[in-house]
């Protein structure tokens, strides 16, 4: 082979980048499994490459390259990843307490069950399986990652059932094919049909065995049904017995179609020698079976000697095979209208063509049938014909099935059933539930639907031997039996707690993990979804069908009406064990308990105030928003709350004495016996005795007894001056300062009124004076009685004050002569270290100097003791931290020269 040079990697780069393929590159040849290339030409220039890129690529330039091992490598990597820590797994599957790590995308692709769960809740990280064992699930998880099963033969049915439950389609197909192949191989190994029958019979439980044919049944009820329907005649030969035995392991087949498969037919020499006799016997048996089928389908029958004619009703245990019975009937019975048979004269059916099917209608009672055999059996109800006779007591019946039931009374081997089933409408006793159902449908048709619904809900097919509770399905009974054991197989996915039932686990999760559940309409929260649903139905929707017979009020629930009637009766059954207060409703009692426990769970976002109830918070928020949505139709006045509007309308416009309906509650102070209307007012008052000041300023650490006082105090630390004077340009931080300015500077309010107001406040303030303060108290009282200029008593009082105490001063009006134009000098005996003199400031031009002096001449500085509760208004006190306090108080400009009143000397 001629050696050729290989092309460099430029060729590959050209293919990847999409270069134009020239003829020189097509010289590549495959020789002996190796790809070789001829010498490539020189690399094209950039201009040529750009022209080639502008040309549209042709389809033959593209190549399909695939890796056969990539899929397997991907699954292998994912399988290895889930078995190591840490991993990229994002799902935890818990089966019988054992945890399996998996990838969501893998289980969602392979299982429709997981796909539905993860699609519904994409954020789910934990899934718990209750109906699958951990060993079986381990096989299925291995299959999802490796597409292979490595199981024992006996495990195949269990894995198949779990695969159907999890809806793993590929696993179901694979296991079904394996199961069928194994079953066919097992059948081919058998030498004869008898061995096959023996093998299949051995698989059945040996707990219940038929004494006639030695058949085995798993349940006693199946044996009873077998005895009642099979051994009505013992004249059938070996073939019939073989056919009846084969019936026991046929799955979901019709009870009316019991043909034996061809492979199981008995072809022994004895039957072959019988010749025509065997054929006659076979023909007789076939006719007898057909007659039995027709008889069993008769809707009218008698079940006792009293000649009560009943209609047939399919029992609960036959409900599973009802559809298959119809299919088999279509194969064996002639369709309606094919043959009239031996129908009595005058009872010829009326044929009705309905949807490509003929229906037979009885001319006597207008009942319809789709099979001629059923109609023939029905005609015996009208003719009175009873062709089936008991060979023991010669009692005759119109159908073979009723004769079979009757023969159970004469059988010694079968336990005789007493008439323990009582009709709820006529109190008649019946031997079985089936005959009772026929009786109700025949003689109480108006109550038939009610009886059937009760029968389905209270079926005794599966009954617990411990508590005698009945269930309609076997899995329900099996799950119920867990309650009588110590097992707790149901684990909570959020915690480590286990439960005996799924319902108990669900209630636990709703109460402790999934709540609270808020109402979208009113915002109220509930611990579980049941209470939320009940709240929505009762509060926000539904009809008010319960009406109070006293006041006519309508409510949605009966329990609500019962609680409403307590208003008229005065009953209050809910008693608080802490304070002894009684309540009419349980909800009011539970809300009251929050008061004792200080459970204020609803907080205002604006001011931080907390409330016990959500509706209280909603009403409080209207204070911040200023919303007044409730307007009076008479006067147009608006209110923030509806109850306030109601009280206003009744009291103002209707003239009702609304407040007389409510008993006033008063709270008395235990110390001073003072009475307050509100409990909060009493609490604030009691702080005057205890000295408690719970509200502290975070800036200056000053404490206050009332929160409102702290709020006003905080304005001092800010630069905001929100209160403006309407008469001048003066601004104030507090509203009371603005009021004082208007009253005293602009003279809108007379000094006498202001003085009287000050006197009232001074006398109303609760004060406690020490022995040192009694002198000042007497002087104050004397001044209020006869306002005049203070004499030297004030100076004498000031001499007793400690030098280390800063003496507060206040402005007191005095009588000055009109001719005097200079201020009377006053000096104090305070040390200079307490307050320093402010530096001189330029005089303001907004107010004339003469006006300033004339205004100041009306006041003098009167010192007061420092260790008393100030008997004057707070706005009258000078703040040493604010040099322009006096100017602000009088409405002067901040630049006006104001001398500090706490100087080292007080000139007199």
UniProtKB/Swiss-Prot annotation:
Ranges of Basic and acidic residues composition bias in the record: 279-296
Composition-biased stretches (Basic residues): 252-261
Limits of the BTB domain: 89-153
Organism: Mus musculus
SMART domains named in the record: BTB, ZnF_C2H2
Keywords, sorted A to Z: DNA-binding, Metal-binding, Nucleus, Repeat, Transcription, Transcription regulation, Zinc, Zinc-finger
Compartments, record wording: Nucleus
GO cellular component, one term: nucleus
Role: May be involved in transcriptional regulation.
ZnF start-end (C2H2-type): 208-231, 360-382, 388-410, 421-444, 462-484, 490-513, 517-540, 546-568, 574-596, 602-624, 630-653, 667-689, 695-717, 723-746
Record-level Gene Ontology MF annotations: DNA binding; zinc ion binding
Biased segments, Acidic residues type: 267-276, 297-336
Gene this chain is encoded by: Zbtb41
Protein's recorded name: Zinc finger and BTB domain-containing protein 41
Keyword Transcription: yes
Chain residue ranges for the region called Disordered: 38-59, 252-344
One Pfam family of this chain: zf-C2H2
């Amino acid at each position: 082979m001629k050696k050729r040079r290989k092309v460099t990697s430029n060729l590959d780069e050209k293919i990847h980048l999409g270069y134009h393929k020239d003829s020189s590159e097509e010289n590549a040849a495959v020789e002996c499994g190796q790809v070789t290339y001829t010498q490539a030409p020189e690399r094209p220039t950039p201009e040529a490459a750009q022209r080639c890129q502008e040309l549209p690529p042709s389809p033959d330039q593209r190549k399909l390259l695939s890796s056969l091992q990539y899929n397997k490598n991907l699954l292998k990597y994912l399988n290895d990843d889930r078995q190591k820590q840490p991993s990229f797994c994002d799902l935890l599957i818990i089966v019988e307490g054992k945890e399996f790590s998996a990838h969501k995308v893998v289980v969602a692709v392979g299982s429709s069950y997981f796909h539905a769960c993860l699609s519904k809740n994409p954020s789910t990280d934990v899934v718990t399986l209750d109906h699958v064992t951990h060993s079986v699930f381990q096989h299925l998880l291995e299959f999802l990652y490796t597409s292979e099963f490595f199981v024992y033969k006996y495990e195949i049915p269990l894995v198949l059932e779990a695969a159907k439950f999890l809806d793993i389609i590929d696993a179901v197909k694979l296991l079904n094919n394996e199961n069928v192949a194994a079953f066919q191989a097992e059948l081919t190994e058998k030498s004869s049909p008898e061995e096959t029958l023996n093998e299949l019979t051995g698989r059945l439980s040996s707990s219940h065995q038929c004494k006639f044919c030695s058949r085995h049944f798993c349940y006693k009820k199946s044996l009873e049904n077998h005895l009642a329907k099979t051994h009505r005649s013992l004249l059938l030969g070996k073939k019939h017995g073989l056919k009846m035995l084969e019936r026991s392991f046929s799955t979901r087949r019709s009870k009316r179609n019991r043909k034996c498969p061809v492979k199981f037919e008995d072809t022994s020499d004895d039957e072959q020698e019988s010749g025509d006799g065997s054929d006659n016997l076979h023909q007789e048996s076939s006719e007898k079976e057909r007659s039995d089928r027709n008889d069993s389908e008769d809707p009218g029958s008698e079940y006792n000697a009293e000649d009560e004619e009943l209609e047939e009703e399919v029992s609960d245990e036959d409900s599973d095979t009802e559809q298959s019975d119809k299919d088999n009937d279509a194969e064996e019975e002639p369709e309606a209208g094919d043959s009239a048979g031996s129908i009595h004269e005058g009872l010829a059916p009326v044929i009705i063509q309905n949807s490509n099917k003929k229906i037979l209608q009885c001319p006597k009672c207008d009942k319809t049938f789709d099979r001629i055999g059923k109609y023939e059996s029905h005609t015996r109800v009208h003719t009175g014909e009873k062709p089936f006779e008991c060979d023991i007591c010669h009692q005759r019946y119109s159908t073979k099935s009723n004769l079979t039931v009757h023969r159970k009374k004469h059988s010694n081997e079968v336990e005789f059933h007493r008439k323990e089933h009582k009709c709820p409408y006529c109190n008649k006793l019946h031997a079985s539930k089936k005959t009772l159902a026929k009786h109700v449908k025949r003689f109480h048709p108006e109550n038939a639907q009610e009886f059937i619904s009760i029968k389905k809900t209270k079926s005794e097919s599966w009954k617990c031997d411990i508590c005698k509770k009945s269930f309609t399905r076997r899995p329900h009974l099996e799950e119920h039996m867990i309650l009588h054991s110590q097992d707790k197989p149901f684990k909570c996915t959020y915690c480590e707690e286990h439960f005996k039932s799924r319902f108990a686990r669900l209630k636990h999760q709703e109460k402790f993990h999934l709540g609270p559940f808020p109402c979208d309409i009113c915002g109220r929260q509930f611990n579980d979804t049941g209470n939320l649903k009940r709240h929505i139905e009762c509060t926000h929707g539904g009809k008010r069908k319960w009406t109070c017979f006293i006041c006519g009020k309508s409510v949605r629930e009966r329990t609500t009406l019962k609680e409403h009637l307590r208003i008229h009766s005065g009953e209050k059954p809910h008693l608080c064990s802490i304070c002894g207060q009684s309540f009419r409703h349980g909800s009011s009692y539970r809300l009251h308990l929050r008061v004792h426990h200080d459970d204020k769970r609803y907080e205002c976002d604006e001011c931080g105030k907390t409330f016990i109830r959500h509706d209280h918070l909603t009403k409080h928020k209207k204070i911040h928003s200023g919303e007044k949505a409730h307007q009076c139709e008479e006067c147009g006045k608006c209110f923030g709350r509806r109850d306030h509007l109601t009280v206003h309308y009744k009291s103002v416009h209707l003239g009702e004495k609304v407040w007389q309906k409510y008993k006033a509650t008063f709270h008395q102070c235990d110390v001073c016996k003072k009475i307050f209307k509100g409990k909060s007012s009493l609490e604030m008052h009691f702080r005057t005795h205890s000295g408690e000041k719970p509200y502290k300023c975070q800036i200056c650490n000053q404490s206050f007894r009332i929160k409102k006082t702290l709020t006003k105090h905080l304005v001092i630390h800010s630069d905001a001056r929100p209160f403006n004077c309407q008469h001048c340009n003066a601004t104030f931080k507090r509203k009371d300062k603005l009021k004082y300015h208007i009253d005293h500077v602009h003279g809108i309010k007379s000094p006498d009124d202001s003085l009287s107001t000050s006197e009232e406040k001074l006398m109303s303030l609760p004060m406690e004076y020490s022995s040192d303060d009694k002198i000042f108290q007497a002087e104050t009282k004397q001044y209020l009685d006869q306002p005049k200029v203070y004499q030297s008593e004030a100076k004498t009082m000031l001499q007793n004050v400690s030098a280390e105490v800063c003496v507060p001063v206040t402005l007191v009006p005095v009588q000055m002569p009109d001719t005097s134009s200079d201020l009377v000098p006053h000096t104090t005996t305070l040390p200079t270290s307490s307050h320093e003199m402010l530096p001189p400031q330029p005089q303001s031009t907004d107010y004339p100097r003469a006006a300033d002096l004339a205004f100041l001449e009306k006041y003098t500085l009167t010192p007061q003791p420092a260790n008393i509760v100030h008997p004057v208004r707070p706005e009258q006190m000078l703040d040493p931290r604010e040099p322009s306090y006096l100017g602000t108080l009088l409405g002067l400009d901040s630049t006006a020269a104001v001398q500090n009143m706490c100087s080292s000397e007080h000139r007199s």
